[in-house]
């Protein structure tokens, strides 16, 4: 449905070309410092208006906090935030109504709901929905930082086939990458990736990418041993983001090609506590956190809407046809989508930390 979480529960609403998208966040502890400037900074991270092919719609991300915050502090009641859609242009979509775009969710929505869905801009299946997740993620990140001192960040390791050349980066390197034109730690890769984006746009095409989410050290004990594993909940949350095609934790699929003697993280003492020497597993064992940073990578497919002729079916005439999308579209969803993955990570961590008793109901200072 449209909600995720057990105690810290996030519900998003709204369509791409409706009046607004928004989120209701329940289970927020009282006493968390939170203000509009901070939320605005988080929302602005997804704009990329300085690279027009990444965001031709370029919404201002004007938002309104309706409830749950007073005098810069959370009140413990549900927080409701709406982000207004001011630059949607729907006429492009009238020509392709009942002609599902290859690679998009149009066909799946039609087969499930018939004509009872808002197809404009992809409706709920649009990347625009993720702005609500990022607003909720901003709240979640503030909670994590102010209670258990955990930070979450993300970056792109590949965009349009252009990969970063470094693997010796730190969490701070990743966090600072958002000060660059693209969230990549490698300046040379950024320059090449921008050229790839522009070339793809010129050719009426699109590109995919791979991103990575990292945290600082997460307290041990988040997650349950079997069906409520932290790893499983993270995977579910991230795979719900539009355009996501895969996820791998730590070294992921590389571990499948190793022997156990290579793959196993040796356990050592550090400051009197058992720790992993290498963290190849990405910060979790048995699906639970173990005091290490959490790390995973996510693959995003190319944007389905492209300006090249594609074969489809006219669902009213029941005939094969071709369509060429003439509207605005992001050449790649990856830069915005990895930010949504960062937000979903924070949301899941807060939910599990509250359930584990690490975050109290009321923060008294």
Curated annotation (Swiss-Prot):
Binding site for FMN: 124-126, 286, 301-305, 328
Gene Ontology biological process: amino acid biosynthetic process; aromatic amino acid family biosynthetic process; chorismate biosynthetic process
Catalytic activity of the protein: 5-O-(1-carboxyvinyl)-3-phosphoshikimate = chorismate + phosphate
Binding site for NADP(+): 46
GO molecular function, one term: chorismate synthase activity
Enzyme Commission no: 4.2.3.5
The protein's enzyme class: lyase
InterPro entries, per the entry: Chorismate_synth (IPR000453), Chorismate_synth_AroC_sf (IPR035904), Chorismate_synthase_CS (IPR020541)
GO cellular component labels: cytosol
Any Pfam family the entry gives: Chorismate_synt
UniProt entry keywords in alphabetical sequence: Amino-acid biosynthesis, Aromatic amino acid biosynthesis, FAD, Flavoprotein, FMN, Lyase, NADP
UniProt function note: This reaction introduces a second double bond into the aromatic ring system.
Protein name per the record: Chorismate synthase
Organism this protein belongs to: Caldivirga maquilingensis (strain ATCC 700844 / DSM 13496 / JCM 10307 / IC-167)
Lineage, opening ranks: Archaea, Thermoproteota, Thermoprotei, Thermoproteales, Thermoproteaceae
